[in-house]
């Protein structure tokens, strides 16, 4: 599959329980939004959405930061079917 650079928002990094709690809270606040958890030793990371441009990501980041103050945007290579 083809990969592209996308802009993602990370809402949590820490313990497995904390990641699960963040995922559940986010799902209730923003249903039908892409949400994934990954493990990068020693942290579980909860990531949401996938945007083509940083500007698109910034618009959503403002909303997400109300409930997830440590949320931030980062670039990631993803498969094109996630966009």
Give the location of each predicted region.
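Acidic/polar low-complexity segments and flexible, solvent-exposed patches
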Residues: 1-83
């Amino acid at each position: 599959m083809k990969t592209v650079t996308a802009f993602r928002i990370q809402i949590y990094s820490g313990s497995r329980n904390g990641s699960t709690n963040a995922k559940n809270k986010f799902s209730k606040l923003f249903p039908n939004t892409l949400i994934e958890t990954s493990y990068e030793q020693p942290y579980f990371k909860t990531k949401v959405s996938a945007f083509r441009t940083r500007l698109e990501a910034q618009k959503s980041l403002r909303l997400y930061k109300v409930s997830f103050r440590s949320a931030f945007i980062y670039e990631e290579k993803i498969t094109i079917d996630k966009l």
